[in-house]
Design a protein with these regions (language model features):
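N-terminal, Lys/Arg- and Ser/Thr-rich interaction peptides
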Residues: 2-4, 9-12, 16-73
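Catalytic cores and adjacent binding grooves of peptidoglycan-active enzymes
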Residues: 6-8, 12-16, 23, 132-234
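Cell-envelope/glycan interface and biosynthesis
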Residues: 59-170
Length: 234
Protein backbone atom coordinates (compact mmCIF):
# COMPACT_ATOMS: atom_id res chain seq x y z
CA UNK A 1 0.00 0.00 0.00
CA UNK A 2 1.15 3.54 -0.65
CA UNK A 3 0.92 4.28 3.07
CA UNK A 4 -0.59 7.65 2.27
CA UNK A 5 -4.03 6.90 3.66
CA UNK A 6 -5.35 10.17 5.02
CA UNK A 7 -6.75 10.09 8.52
CA UNK A 8 -10.32 11.29 8.29
CA UNK A 9 -11.36 14.51 9.96
CA UNK A 10 -14.70 14.72 11.72
CA UNK A 11 -16.12 18.25 11.42
CA UNK A 12 -17.04 20.22 14.52
CA UNK A 13 -20.75 21.01 14.58
CA UNK A 14 -20.13 23.91 16.95
CA UNK A 15 -17.84 25.65 14.45
CA UNK A 16 -18.77 29.16 13.38
CA UNK A 17 -16.25 29.78 10.64
CA UNK A 18 -17.97 32.63 8.87
CA UNK A 19 -20.15 30.53 6.60
CA UNK A 20 -23.09 32.21 4.92
CA UNK A 21 -25.46 29.83 6.75
CA UNK A 22 -25.27 31.02 10.32
CA UNK A 23 -27.82 32.07 12.90
CA UNK A 24 -26.54 34.11 15.85
CA UNK A 25 -23.05 32.74 15.29
CA UNK A 26 -24.19 29.14 14.87
CA UNK A 27 -25.49 27.15 11.96
CA UNK A 28 -29.25 27.00 11.90
CA UNK A 29 -30.82 23.65 12.80
CA UNK A 30 -34.00 24.54 10.93
CA UNK A 31 -34.76 24.22 7.23
CA UNK A 32 -34.24 27.45 5.24
CA UNK A 33 -37.55 29.24 4.67
CA UNK A 34 -37.94 31.38 1.58
CA UNK A 35 -35.75 32.10 -1.42
CA UNK A 36 -33.29 34.43 0.33
CA UNK A 37 -32.68 32.00 3.18
CA UNK A 38 -32.19 29.17 0.69
CA UNK A 39 -29.73 31.30 -1.30
CA UNK A 40 -27.73 32.04 1.84
CA UNK A 41 -27.66 28.35 2.76
CA UNK A 42 -26.53 27.20 -0.67
CA UNK A 43 -23.58 29.63 -0.53
CA UNK A 44 -22.12 27.67 2.37
CA UNK A 45 -18.59 26.61 1.53
CA UNK A 46 -17.88 23.00 2.40
CA UNK A 47 -14.24 22.84 1.31
CA UNK A 48 -11.71 24.50 -0.97
CA UNK A 49 -13.61 23.65 -4.16
CA UNK A 50 -17.15 22.74 -3.13
CA UNK A 51 -20.23 24.65 -1.96
CA UNK A 52 -23.52 23.28 -0.67
CA UNK A 53 -25.31 24.21 -3.87
CA UNK A 54 -23.18 21.69 -5.79
CA UNK A 55 -24.96 18.84 -4.01
CA UNK A 56 -28.63 19.82 -4.00
CA UNK A 57 -29.87 19.25 -7.56
CA UNK A 58 -32.26 16.32 -7.91
CA UNK A 59 -34.13 15.26 -11.04
CA UNK A 60 -36.83 13.80 -8.81
CA UNK A 61 -37.27 17.09 -6.96
CA UNK A 62 -37.21 19.12 -10.17
CA UNK A 63 -39.77 16.97 -12.02
CA UNK A 64 -42.06 16.28 -9.07
CA UNK A 65 -41.90 19.73 -7.46
CA UNK A 66 -40.42 18.51 -4.17
CA UNK A 67 -38.14 20.36 -1.75
CA UNK A 68 -34.57 19.09 -1.57
CA UNK A 69 -33.35 21.29 1.29
CA UNK A 70 -32.25 19.69 4.58
CA UNK A 71 -34.38 19.99 7.67
CA UNK A 72 -31.21 20.22 9.78
CA UNK A 73 -28.77 22.44 7.83
CA UNK A 74 -26.23 22.40 10.66
CA UNK A 75 -25.85 18.61 10.51
CA UNK A 76 -25.94 18.55 6.69
CA UNK A 77 -23.10 21.09 6.55
CA UNK A 78 -20.96 19.18 9.04
CA UNK A 79 -21.47 15.87 7.23
CA UNK A 80 -20.91 17.51 3.84
CA UNK A 81 -17.64 18.97 5.03
CA UNK A 82 -16.52 15.53 6.14
CA UNK A 83 -17.26 14.20 2.65
CA UNK A 84 -15.66 17.08 0.77
CA UNK A 85 -12.54 17.61 2.86
CA UNK A 86 -11.67 13.95 3.37
CA UNK A 87 -12.69 12.42 0.04
CA UNK A 88 -13.73 14.73 -2.78
CA UNK A 89 -10.92 17.28 -2.46
CA UNK A 90 -8.08 14.72 -2.56
CA UNK A 91 -9.85 12.77 -5.33
CA UNK A 92 -10.25 15.91 -7.44
CA UNK A 93 -6.72 17.13 -6.69
CA UNK A 94 -5.38 13.85 -8.08
CA UNK A 95 -7.68 13.07 -11.03
CA UNK A 96 -9.07 16.47 -12.03
CA UNK A 97 -12.59 17.80 -11.98
CA UNK A 98 -15.33 15.57 -10.58
CA UNK A 99 -18.88 15.54 -11.94
CA UNK A 100 -21.38 15.37 -9.08
CA UNK A 101 -24.43 13.24 -9.81
CA UNK A 102 -26.91 12.31 -7.07
CA UNK A 103 -25.85 13.79 -3.73
CA UNK A 104 -28.05 15.10 -0.92
CA UNK A 105 -31.65 13.83 -0.86
CA UNK A 106 -34.26 15.09 1.56
CA UNK A 107 -36.41 12.37 3.16
CA UNK A 108 -39.31 13.60 1.00
CA UNK A 109 -37.31 13.25 -2.22
CA UNK A 110 -35.68 9.97 -1.28
CA UNK A 111 -38.94 8.49 -0.03
CA UNK A 112 -40.64 9.35 -3.32
CA UNK A 113 -37.76 7.81 -5.26
CA UNK A 114 -37.86 4.64 -3.20
CA UNK A 115 -41.63 4.16 -3.44
CA UNK A 116 -41.55 4.74 -7.21
CA UNK A 117 -38.55 2.46 -7.85
CA UNK A 118 -36.30 5.30 -8.99
CA UNK A 119 -33.04 3.76 -7.80
CA UNK A 120 -33.34 5.05 -4.23
CA UNK A 121 -32.88 2.90 -1.14
CA UNK A 122 -35.26 3.35 1.78
CA UNK A 123 -35.14 6.45 3.96
CA UNK A 124 -33.83 4.32 6.82
CA UNK A 125 -30.96 2.92 4.74
CA UNK A 126 -30.04 6.38 3.46
CA UNK A 127 -29.62 7.98 6.89
CA UNK A 128 -26.04 9.36 7.08
CA UNK A 129 -25.68 8.47 3.40
CA UNK A 130 -27.65 10.40 0.75
CA UNK A 131 -29.64 12.02 3.57
CA UNK A 132 -26.87 14.03 5.18
CA UNK A 133 -29.03 15.62 7.87
CA UNK A 134 -30.12 12.37 9.49
CA UNK A 135 -27.79 10.37 11.73
CA UNK A 136 -27.78 6.59 11.41
CA UNK A 137 -29.31 4.28 14.00
CA UNK A 138 -26.08 4.37 16.00
CA UNK A 139 -26.00 8.16 16.17
CA UNK A 140 -23.22 8.63 13.62
CA UNK A 141 -23.23 11.27 10.91
CA UNK A 142 -22.18 10.70 7.33
CA UNK A 143 -22.62 11.89 3.77
CA UNK A 144 -22.52 10.19 0.38
CA UNK A 145 -22.56 11.37 -3.22
CA UNK A 146 -22.47 9.79 -6.66
CA UNK A 147 -19.59 11.03 -8.80
CA UNK A 148 -18.24 10.56 -12.30
CA UNK A 149 -14.48 10.91 -12.76
CA UNK A 150 -13.86 12.08 -16.35
CA UNK A 151 -10.22 10.96 -16.03
CA UNK A 152 -11.50 7.41 -15.59
CA UNK A 153 -14.14 7.67 -18.34
CA UNK A 154 -11.50 8.85 -20.82
CA UNK A 155 -9.37 5.78 -20.11
CA UNK A 156 -12.05 3.10 -20.34
CA UNK A 157 -11.03 2.39 -23.96
CA UNK A 158 -7.48 1.78 -22.75
CA UNK A 159 -8.66 -0.99 -20.48
CA UNK A 160 -8.66 0.92 -17.19
CA UNK A 161 -11.23 -0.75 -14.96
CA UNK A 162 -13.47 0.33 -12.12
CA UNK A 163 -11.62 -2.12 -9.89
CA UNK A 164 -8.40 -0.14 -10.37
CA UNK A 165 -10.07 3.06 -9.20
CA UNK A 166 -11.69 1.21 -6.31
CA UNK A 167 -8.38 -0.15 -5.05
CA UNK A 168 -6.68 3.25 -5.45
CA UNK A 169 -9.34 4.83 -3.24
CA UNK A 170 -9.15 1.91 -0.80
CA UNK A 171 -5.41 2.39 -0.35
CA UNK A 172 -5.35 6.17 -0.26
CA UNK A 173 -8.57 7.67 1.13
CA UNK A 174 -10.58 7.22 4.36
CA UNK A 175 -13.82 6.25 2.61
CA UNK A 176 -16.66 4.37 4.26
CA UNK A 177 -18.32 2.77 1.24
CA UNK A 178 -18.07 2.63 -2.54
CA UNK A 179 -20.65 1.32 -5.01
CA UNK A 180 -19.86 1.25 -8.72
CA UNK A 181 -22.41 1.53 -11.56
CA UNK A 182 -22.22 0.58 -15.27
CA UNK A 183 -22.97 4.00 -16.80
CA UNK A 184 -19.85 6.18 -17.06
CA UNK A 185 -18.33 4.07 -14.27
CA UNK A 186 -20.09 6.39 -11.83
CA UNK A 187 -19.77 5.44 -8.20
CA UNK A 188 -21.11 6.29 -4.79
CA UNK A 189 -18.45 7.45 -2.37
CA UNK A 190 -19.36 7.89 1.27
CA UNK A 191 -17.75 9.47 4.31
CA UNK A 192 -18.86 8.33 7.76
CA UNK A 193 -17.80 8.83 11.36
CA UNK A 194 -17.52 5.04 11.71
CA UNK A 195 -16.30 3.95 8.25
CA UNK A 196 -17.39 0.52 7.01
CA UNK A 197 -14.69 0.21 4.31
CA UNK A 198 -16.81 -1.79 1.85
CA UNK A 199 -16.67 -1.84 -1.97
CA UNK A 200 -19.65 -3.16 -3.94
CA UNK A 201 -20.32 -3.36 -7.68
CA UNK A 202 -23.58 -3.18 -9.61
CA UNK A 203 -21.51 -4.05 -12.69
CA UNK A 204 -21.64 -7.74 -13.59
CA UNK A 205 -20.69 -9.87 -11.83
CA UNK A 206 -22.44 -7.96 -9.05
CA UNK A 207 -21.23 -8.24 -5.50
CA UNK A 208 -18.59 -7.17 -3.02
CA UNK A 209 -15.07 -6.53 -4.23
CA UNK A 210 -13.96 -6.30 -0.62
CA UNK A 211 -15.18 -5.69 2.90
CA UNK A 212 -13.70 -6.29 6.36
CA UNK A 213 -12.97 -9.98 6.78
CA UNK A 214 -12.26 -10.62 3.11
CA UNK A 215 -8.71 -11.95 2.54
CA UNK A 216 -8.04 -9.14 0.04
CA UNK A 217 -9.08 -6.30 2.38
CA UNK A 218 -5.71 -5.54 3.98
CA UNK A 219 -2.28 -5.09 2.49
CA UNK A 220 -0.81 -3.49 -0.60
CA UNK A 221 -2.99 -3.29 -3.74
CA UNK A 222 -0.81 -0.95 -5.80
CA UNK A 223 -0.17 -3.65 -8.41
CA UNK A 224 -3.89 -3.45 -9.24
CA UNK A 225 -3.74 0.23 -10.27
CA UNK A 226 -0.39 0.55 -12.01
CA UNK A 227 -0.11 3.78 -13.99
CA UNK A 228 -2.40 5.70 -11.65
CA UNK A 229 -1.06 8.97 -10.25
CA UNK A 230 -0.03 9.17 -6.65
CA UNK A 231 -2.20 11.18 -4.26
CA UNK A 232 -1.78 14.89 -4.99
CA UNK A 233 -0.69 17.28 -2.29
CA UNK A 234 -3.51 19.73 -1.76
Amino acid sequence: MTNSLTAFTSPDLSSSSGSACELNGRYSSRAPKGVRAAEEFTRTRLSKSFFMRDFLFSEIAAIEGLSNLPGDPKLAIAAGRGLCENLLEPLQATFGRLAIRSAYRSPEVNGFGCSHRLSCASNEKNRARHTWDRRDKNGHMGALTTVVVPWLVDRMAEGITWQAMAWWIHDNLPYSELQFFPKLLAFNIGWHEAPKRTIYSFIAPRGFLTKPGFPNHDGDHSHLYRGFPGPATQ
